[in-house]
Amino acid sequence: MIYLDTSVALASLFDEPRKPATEFWAQAMVSSRLLEYELLVRFNALGTAPEAVGKARVFLEGIVLVDLDQPALARALQQFPLVVRTLEAIHLATMEFLRVQGLEVEVATYDRRLAETAGAMGFKLADV
């Protein structure tokens, strides 16, 4: 299963040159509910047309979103192998929560810091 980071979702939704190949999206996807907030806040901040916001909502329907619960948020407050920012910490804590639940994920991200820290934590990186 692929853990989808916001950087890859935005690249796809904004049709950037570095977006993943079409076949990438055939895989099962999971992410933190944080993804929903990051995407919709970004779209709203840009004053994006309602149709584009609707496209983002449809995009999110294809992804299993893990709620931001207290254990994951508490883990995000703890130290990671490398220095991370708040949103990265929440994504990493969610990935760790999934691993504890027995679900191994590959991380799809364009965020260098997130990729390096996820790798240091033993997560595989998806080819995006």
Predicted segments with their positions:
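Short, well-structured N-terminal submotif of metal-dependent ribonuclease cores
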Residues: 1-35, 43-58, 123
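Short, charged, low-hydrophobicity "junction" segments
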Residues: 47, 61-66
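Short hydrophobic/aromatic patches at helix-to-coil boundaries
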Residues: 124-128
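Short glycine/serine- and small hydrophobic-enriched flexible loop segments
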Residues: 41-45, 96-97
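Active-site neighborhoods of divalent-metal-dependent phosphate/nucleic-acid chemistry enzymes
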Residues: 65-113, 121-123
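Short linear capping/connector segments at secondary-structure termini
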Residues: 56-60, 73-76
